[in-house]
Amino acid sequence: MSTELVEDEAQFYCKAQKYWKNVPATVDGMLGGYGHISNIDLNGSKKFLQRFLRQEGSNKTGNMYALDCGAGIGRITKRLLLPLFKKVDMVDVTDEFLSKAKSYLGEEGSRVGNYFCCGLQEFSPEPNRYDVIWIQWVIGHLTDEHLVDFLKRCSLGLRPNGIIVIKDNVTQDVSIMDDVDSSICRDIDLVRKLIKQAGLSLLAVERQENFPDEIYHVFSFAMR
């Protein structure tokens, strides 16, 4: 379990919060200096998501409302979710990022319903509200127990045929703690195990292509 890497839970969360307080409210800041990969990332995400939005028949995922978790300034909200959904809610632990989002999103930001300033370990989506809950590059800031609990709460937040998507760095063997931003990069088998513990079933798993060789492999997991 990766939580064994967390010696002091309160410190784990506090250190991460302090780290993000000092990160510039820019796309490059959101991506740790890798702003140049944003388009590749968003194109891969759109392709992954549209397989569910374009499904034929009764299993098709709706396009009414999405939730962006760990939303930052709204990079994903602006370029992925607002073009595909009628409304979007954003949740992030850093108030300065959400404040910046209101100008960064421009006119389309009028379709953002709520800006929730909250850590995901304390956040509960409104039941039966969202067609898609998008969780990208943020699960490393949750302990295993809090991640499982959060996914359970997300499951309750889904509308019929809704899906949860996790997109994040994974390792192939052991989980690794990053002491700089106080986050855990989990091994892919552990991510699958925690999803199962939350009572969710995987619908699709896909590796993001065309990312720089020096960064961790990034996988998308769709579930409900």
Swiss-Prot record:
One GO cellular component, as annotated: nucleus
Catalyzed chemical reaction(s): N-terminal L-alanyl-L-prolyl-L-lysyl-[protein] + 3 S-adenosyl-L-methionine = N-terminal N,N,N-trimethyl-L-alanyl-L-prolyl-L-lysyl-[protein] + 3 S-adenosyl-L-homocysteine + 3 H(+); N-terminal L-seryl-L-prolyl-L-lysyl-[protein] + 3 S-adenosyl-L-methionine = N-terminal N,N,N-trimethyl-L-seryl-L-prolyl-L-lysyl-[protein] + 3 S-adenosyl-L-homocysteine + 3 H(+); N-terminal L-prolyl-L-prolyl-L-lysyl-[protein] + 2 S-adenosyl-L-methionine = N-terminal N,N-dimethyl-L-prolyl-L-prolyl-L-lysyl-[protein] + 2 S-adenosyl-L-homocysteine + 2 H(+)
Top EC class of this enzyme: transferase
Pfam families linked: Methyltransf_PK
GO biological process, one term: N-terminal peptidyl-proline dimethylation
GO molecular function: histone methyltransferase activity; N-terminal protein N-methyltransferase activity; protein methyltransferase activity
Tree of life domain: Eukaryota
Keyword Acetylation annotated: no
UniProt key word Methyltransferase: yes
UniProt xrefs under InterPro entries: MeTrfase_NTM1, SAM-dependent_MTases_sf
Subcellular locations according to the entry: Nucleus
EC number from the UniProt entry: 2.1.1.244
Keywords in alphabetical order: Methyltransferase, Nucleus, S-adenosyl-L-methionine, Transferase
Primary location group: nucleus
Binding site for S-adenosyl-L-methionine: G70, R75, D92, V93, T94, L120, Q121, Q136
The protein's role, per its UniProt record: Distributive alpha-N-methyltransferase that methylates the N-terminus of target proteins containing the N-terminal motif [Ala/Gly/Pro/Ser]-Pro-Lys when the initiator Met is cleaved. Specifically catalyzes mono-, di- or tri-methylation of the exposed alpha-amino group of the Ala, Gly or Ser residue in the [Ala/Gly/Ser]-Pro-Lys motif and mono- or di-methylation of Pro in the Pro-Pro-Lys motif. Required during mitosis for normal bipolar spindle formation and chromosome segregation via its action on target proteins.
Family membership: Belongs to the methyltransferase superfamily. NTM1 family.
Protein name: N-terminal Xaa-Pro-Lys N-methyltransferase 1
Source organism (scientific name): Xenopus tropicalis (Western clawed frog)
